[in-house]
From Swiss-Prot:
Additional facts recorded: This protein may be expected to contain an N-terminal transit peptide but none has been predicted.
Name of the protein in its database record: Translation factor GUF1 homolog, mitochondrial
Enzyme Commission number(s) from the entry: 3.6.5.-
Species of provenance: Ostreococcus tauri
Bilayer topology annotation: Peripheral membrane protein
Lineage: Eukaryota, Viridiplantae, Chlorophyta, Mamiellophyceae, Mamiellales
InterPro entries: EF-4 (IPR006297), EFG_III/V (IPR035647), EFG_V-like (IPR000640), G_TR_CS (IPR031157), LepA_C_sf (IPR038363), LepA_CTD (IPR013842), LepA_IV (IPR035654), P-loop_NTPase (IPR027417)
Major location (coarse): mitochondrion
UniProt cross-references to HAMAP family, sorted A to Z: LepA
Assigned GO CC terms: mitochondrial inner membrane; mitochondrial matrix
Pfam families per record: EFG_C, GTP_EFTU, LepA_C
Binding-site residues for GTP, renumbered to this chain: 72-79, 142-146, 196-199
Keyword list, A-Z: GTP-binding, Hydrolase, Membrane, Mitochondrion, Mitochondrion inner membrane, Nucleotide-binding, Protein biosynthesis
Length: 667
């Protein structure tokens, strides 16, 4: 550590510029992952009173409290607008020298690296409104925009009474814009429409505003014209929140009821909970009880996120803040739980929100089997912070002990993998993704959930009385009118059924399709972007189950099934998928002294095969002339030896080979 610090001081000049090359060089030198967070130098606030304090935050009554969220399609500027609102209210200092605060609420390294919001973040800010001169407490929740993190959006909206619906003025209404609008509408939230990025030369404010009027049914004069980059009309957003969004519907004098919104693990303090007090008052030192588990807690610390944590002794009805208890066990916190005072037995549970339903399953295994306990601890702590992930223990003959994890999509899974590596140092192998199928036995009309290919017999069920149903989704695709033909071809190739086609405006079309989830989860989004040159967007929701000809395809190496490579595919696509995976495995496996046969099979039927030729050893090199029978005898002896090696030898597939094959997208 001393050597590391010494080297950091020596390279301070390079690191002050956040040089990626310098950081990479130091990481390689010390064989460690180094992360640097850059803070802009700041200028003082206009008034010392602008900085929020615990006394000022707790003094705001319920009727002057507003809980709202910013929702939009990915990359439409939610986090950027949130930064300007925080600067405007004095929650963060304005950066000096022309620099701007960026992604203040995106605290995870993976969020800053990818430039997307993964976790919804809540922050309490104070705003003095010009209409009445009163100070208001605004609890702002910045939400993700990608469809894979819709659970974070739904969870955030359950704590809100209004939402700022943001639309990029250069892009217009997108598929996820419509999805988040209906999420907010289902919760009876007040919608504040706003067109963002109006400062850009390519912005078409009137066209986008008319789209919002037509799609969302809002009035044209309700649409705010803002710029998250420059802060244009940011104060109008705050005024609209104060004037249009109602205060929380809670009873400050009632019995305590608090909703557990989120939780994260801290190495020093244990579980740090994000709570919203709905009724009553929560004090530091209170003895509270979980309605779901019946477990008792003592409140050790309370506070507001401003976004800097500010400790307080009390949280009142309508307020959102963090809570630390005397229980460090990560399994004691269940997101969506209702908390109440200990000893009360007639507490009505809060509505909370629906648990997330995993859409994609993957097996996660440690690269080194000795690191399983390390992986177990990492998964346990990370699922506390991301309640939409499910994890069950699983064993594989090829990869050893691991977990079968459920995610909301492939991006969600990829972010989870990155967080395991960056936050806990866990090196993992992820198996091929599969969707949750359902096995139906007609003899007794029972259903069995199937999240692993090994749950299905090789080649399918022998009895016709047993069926497999696959999940369906109803997809909404918004694309330019000139690429509709190629998008229709893509949906047809993915076994889609067209439901509707309509025009959003003169240049863009809305397509609605019913598609198998397995076809969407693989690489549908990437292929959609490729065929539309990046202009098409899509979102989907569950649409039930349907009987389908789904079969298990196995991969055999020298006649031995490799369970980690088993997949569930539609019978019509099994051969194409089989040829693809055996070809990739042939390129990845090292050659041996004997021939290796790589096969893909449906039960006993081989549908694809590749062979890796053996190394040739020149056994006749020591023969200089003489009788030809001597050479033949040596060649026959070599041939017999190779037959014996093929019979008794096992092909050891390295773990990095698994990782390379399973991470490669299909052709």
């Amino acid at each position: 550590m001393r050597r590391v610090l010494k080297e950091l001081c020596r390279n301070a000049t390079a690191l002050s510029a956040s040089s990626n090359a310098s950081t990479t060089a130091l990481s390689q030198r010390f064989r460690s992952t180094l992360s640097f967070f850059r803070y802009h130098s700041s200028v003082p606030l206009k008034n010392a009173d602008d900085a929020p304090t615990a006394d000022r935050l707790t003094a705001v009554p319920l009727e002057r409290t507003r809980n709202f969220s910013i929702i939009a399609h990915v990359d439409h500027g939610k986090s950027t607008l949130a930064d300007r609102l925080l600067e405007l209210t004095g929650a963060i200092r304005r950066a000096s020298g022309g620099a701007r605060n960026e992604q203040v609420l995106d605290t995870l390294p993976v969020e800053r690296r990818r430039g997307i919001t993964v976790k919804a973040q809540a922050v309490s800010i104070l705003h003095r409104d010009e209409s009445d001169g009163e100070e208001y407490l605004l609890n702002l929740i910045d939400t993700p925009g990608h469809a894979d993190f819709s659970f974070e959006v739904a969870r955030s909206l359950s704590a809100c009474d209004g939402a700022v619906l943001l639309v990029d003025a250069t892009q217009g209404v997108e598929a996820q814009t419509i999805a988040t609008f209906y999420l907010a509408l289902d919760r009876n939230l007040v919608i504040i429409p706003a067109a963002n990025k109006v400062d850009m030369s390519s912005a078409d404010v009137e066209r986008v505003a008319n789209q919002m009027v037509r799609v969302f049914g809002v009035e044209r004069d309700e649409v705010l014209e803002v710029s998250g980059k420059t802060g244009l009309n940011a104060e109008k957003v705050l005024s609209a929140v104060v004037q249009r969004v109602p205060p929380p519907r809670g009873n400050p004098d009632g019995s305590l009821r608090a909703l557990l919104l989120d939780c994260r693990y801290d190495d020093f303090r244990g579980a740090v909970n994000l709570v919203q007090v709905v009724d009553g008052v929560l004090h530091k030192g209170d003895k509270i009880t979980s309605l779901a588990s019946g477990q008792h807690f003592e409140v050790l610390e309370l506070g507001f996120n401003t976004p800097t944590p500010i400790a307080t002794n009390v949280l009142s009805a309508g307020q959102v803040g963090y809570m630390i208890t005397n229980v460090r066990d990560v399994r004691s916190s269940k997101v969506g739980d209702t908390l109440h005072m200990r000893g009360l037995t007639t507490i009505e549970p809060l509505a909370g929100f629906r648990p997330a339903k995993p859409m994609v399953f993957q097996g996660l295994f440690p690269v080194n089997s000795d690191d399983f306990e390390k992986l177990r601890a990492a998964v346990s702590k990370l699922t506390l912070n991301d309640a939409s992930v499910t994890a069950q223990a699983e064993n594989s003959s090829a990869l050893g002990a691991g977990f079968r994890c459920g995610f909301l999509g492939l991006l969600h899974a990829d972010v989870f993998h990155q967080r395991l590596q960056e936050e806990f140092g866990a090196e993992i192998i992820a198996t091929a993704p599969t969707v949750p199928y359902r096995i139906k036995h007609q003899s007794d009309d029972t259903y069995i959930d199937c999240t692993s290919p090994l749950s299905v017999p090789s080649g399918g069920f022998p009895s016709k009385s047993t069926e497999i149903e696959e999940p369906l989704v109803e997809a909404t695709i918004i694309c330019p009118s000139n690429v509709v033909g190629t998008i229709l071809e893509l949906c047809a190739d993915r076994r889609g059924e067209q439901l509707e086609q309509s025009f959003l405006d003169d240049s863009r079309v809305i397509l609605r399709y019913k598609l198998p989830l397995g076809e969407v989860a693989a690489d549908f989004a990437d292929e959609l972007k490729s065929r539309s040159s990046g202009y098409a967007t899509f979102d989907y929701e569950e649409a039930g189950m349907r009987k389908s000809d789904i079969v298990r395809m196995d991969v055999l190496v020298n006649g031995v099934i490799v369970d980690a490579l088993a997949t569930l595919v539609h019978r019509t696509k099994a051969q194409r998928h089989g040829k693809d995976i055996v070809a990739r495995l042939k390129d990845a496996l090292p050659r041996q002294l004997y021939e290796i046969a790589i096969q893909a099979s449906l039960g006993s039927k081989i549908i694809a095969r590749e062979d890796i030729r053996a190394f040739r050893k020149q056994v006749t090199s020591k023969c200089y002339g003489g009788d030809i029978t001597r050479k033949k005898k040596l060649l026959e002896k070599q041939k017999e030896g190779k037959r014996r090696m093929r019979r008794i030898g096992n092909v050891d597939i390295p773990n990095d080979t698994f990782a390379g094959i399973l991470s490669t997208k299909r052709d």
